[in-house]
UniProtKB/Swiss-Prot annotation:
Stretches assigned to the tr-type G domain: 11-280
Organism the protein comes from: Enterobacter sp. (strain 638)
Organismal lineage: Bacteria, Pseudomonadati, Pseudomonadota, Gammaproteobacteria, Enterobacterales
Record keywords, A-Z: Cytoplasm, GTP-binding, Nucleotide-binding, Protein biosynthesis
Cellular component annotations (GO), alphabetically ordered: cytosol
Functional summary from the UniProt entry: Increases the formation of ribosomal termination complexes and stimulates activities of RF-1 and RF-2. It binds guanine nucleotides and has strong preference for UGA stop codons. It may interact directly with the ribosome. The stimulation of RF-1 and RF-2 is significantly reduced by GTP and GDP, but not by GMP.
GO molecular function: GTP binding; GTPase activity; guanosine tetraphosphate binding; translation release factor activity, codon nonspecific; translation release factor activity, codon specific
Name by which UniProt lists this protein: Peptide chain release factor 3
One GO-annotated biological process of the protein: regulation of translational termination
Amino acid sequence: MTLSPYLQEVAKRRTFAIISHPDAGKTTITEKVLLFGQAIQTAGTVKGRGSSQHAKSDWMEMEKQRGISITTSVMQFPYHDCLVNLLDTPGHEDFSEDTYRTLTAVDCCLMVIDAAKGVEDRTRKLMEVTRLRDTPILTFMNKLDRDIRDPMEVMDEVERELKIACAPITWPIGCGKLFKGVYHLYKDEVYLYQTGKGHTIQEVRIVKGLDNPELETAVGEELAVQLRDELELVKGASHEFDHELFLAGEITPVFFGTALGNFGVDHMLDGLIEWAPQPMPRKTDTRLVEASEEKFTGFVFKIQANMDPKHRDRVAFLRVVSGQYEKGMKLRQVRIGKDVVISDALTFMAGDRSHVEEAYPGDIIGLHNHGTIQIGDTFTQGEMMKFTGIPNFAPELFRRIRLRDPLKQKQLLKGLVQLSEEGAVQVFRPISNNDLIVGAVGVLQFDVVVARLKSEYNVEAIYESVNVATARWVECSDVKKFEEFKRKNEIQLALDGGDNLTYIAPTMVNLNLTQERYPDVQFRKTREH
């Protein structure tokens, strides 16, 4: 049976994001992936912050200064017969809720682990978010050209800490200065590593078969014997790859390599193309929407301001769930019930914006937005429904915002509410006083907010520490008990940017005690947009 042209386009799409701890090599791997997709000709490794050859996926002024990728950009490139959409996730200490939310817009994730360090804190947090939707995960063990921990030990740590089974697809031969390449367990081939070829795609020398005498010549007798011994152990002790379990988010295929040396990245990409799901169905408040449906639907997962310093615009990033976007089509913005004609949607090659004529499920398009679009907005061809599963996450860091000029309180509030609708920060207004508290997931968000308040709203503000450890959205089905809870805890209650009641806890101990005291009240860590 031949698929219709529309379904052929859907079947080509793969949409994924990379999750890692800062400095595990995420930006480098992004560069190399784009190199294989021929989207850039030579990879501009992210050098020291002063260097002029900035990596392609880092943009916005503050990023250029700090050498980090703050804003979640989107890159589309062809690979084999597929079209891959890679959503970049800010990786530094200065990442934000955008990073979390981006993970709700992809069908698959690539987890990059520094094989010398193993599982790190940020990776744990991001994996928790992928668990909300049981997203399939591929794993790349990076930095094999350095001295690493025992690969078996690192895989055990992944299984233990991230609660996901590991199925090695390739296995390293040596590491550091002795790194010779990898063996592919399912193709029975050895791929040999050459140093100094990191900026280009290299022809890799292949030795066919583990028992091939050429192996000794290529890697030396000692490493060849060691490899065969290790593989007996690996085959006995590790899981076999199972596609069904991978799609359910229960097992991850593991690839070894070095992103900086541009080795092993293509094995991982081949696995992604072969195993990652096509665009997946998504839930709305009324029904499940399948990618095969021909009527257009999509949702906004992120809004970014000033992608173009020359134009002070905001761009809303929309993930297409079903149907085909065509230039000039009329779409309904469901939340406000208004029809809009969209003739200037954008596609992205990090920072290079180009107008898009058409887009299919799995693609990300940018909509120009002058403050009318919010995170979580659903666009359809008329059907009244709302996509679910695009959450707000309870902030982990809090500051009080203070004005230099007290007469600008109104502009400050307007600016903060708009920034919170964009997902740049969350704002809380305590019920018992006139403070304005902002909450974020990464420290840099506070600097971004102060800079944007000044440039976009002409408000000079400073932030200072505040005695808040965490926040939870509260609700209760028993009106009487809820009233009593509100009366007795007024000093800890606040309204967020969308006027939702929030409990602001000065310490985790306070939160735990309050939760025990009021078992009928629900304290939530995430809230639907």
